[in-house]
């Protein structure tokens, strides 16, 4: 199995639950669209030849960016705090250049200043302390290397999204009943949301 450096149940357990059920949803190889490919290269600042470069991906989820990085020729080390790392391992072709583990962004069991690129997309805002997570990642970038991160836009309009209104309630629910509830309410809500966006 994969090396694990964190408890099986942790603050990111709901992400593991989600990505193990919908393991291929965001993979370009599954959708046939270059969504993850384009987002990754835009974040890096343009497509680059990563052959031989050491890349650390933090918060890999089910592997949407891992798939792109693995195809780039880089030596990729990737981890997630949740059990989503199991979905990622299942989604990737075995390669001597791909290394996966379950670990903590605040306590990464790797040598500092040893990666050409450290990449963390769509993750920092989900940690208990985004600023500390950012500082932790920066320690693993080689001198002259690149730290690639992003975070959600923080503004008043974003706070009015239903997910933020409902989060205080859903946070207290067990993940299995919450998932079943979502399966029931989503089919009628999707057409209603599309209608309201016109």
Name each region found by the language model.
Residues 2-111, 117:
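Conserved N-terminal segment of class I S-adenosyl-L-methionine
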Residues 40, 190-198:
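Glycine-rich phosphate/pyrophosphate-binding loop
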Residues 80, 102, 122, 151-153:
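Glycine-rich, histidine-containing beta strand-loop boundary motifs that form or position
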Residues 107, 125, 154:
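Active-site micro-motifs of SAM-dependent methyltransferase domains
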Residues 117-128:
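A short SAM/SAH-binding and catalytic strip from SAM-dependent methyltransferases
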Residues 126-134, 149:
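Repeat-solenoid scaffold signature
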Residues 131-143:
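A short glycine-rich, Lys/Arg-flanked "PGG" loop and its adjoining helix->strand segment in the class I
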Residues 146-191:
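Conserved class I S-adenosyl-L-methionine
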């Amino acid at each position: 199995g994969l090396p694990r450096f964190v408890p099986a149940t942790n603050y990111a357990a709901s992400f593991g639950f989600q990505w193990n059920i919908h393991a291929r949803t965001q993979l370009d190889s599954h959708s046939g669209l270059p969504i993850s490919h384009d987002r990754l290269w835009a974040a890096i600042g343009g497509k680059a030849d990563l052959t031989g470069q050491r890349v650390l991906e933090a918060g890999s989820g089910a592997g949407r960016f891992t798939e792109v990085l693995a195809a780039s020729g880089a030596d990729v080390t990737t981890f997630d705090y949740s059990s989503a790392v199991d979905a990622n391992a299942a989604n990737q072709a075995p390669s001597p250049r791909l290394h996966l583990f379950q670990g903590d962004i605040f306590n990464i069991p790797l040598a500092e200043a040893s990666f050409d690129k450290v990449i963390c997309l769509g993750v920092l805002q989900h940690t208990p302390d985004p600023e500390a997570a950012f500082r932790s990642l920066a320690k693993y970038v080689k001198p002259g290397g690149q730290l690639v991160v992003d975070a959600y836009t923080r503004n008043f309009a974003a706070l009015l999204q239903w997910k933020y209104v409902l989060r205080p309630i859903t946070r207290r629910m067990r993940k299995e009943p919450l998932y079943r509830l979502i399966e029931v309410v989503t089919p009628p809500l999707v057409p209603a949301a599309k209608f309201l966006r016109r």
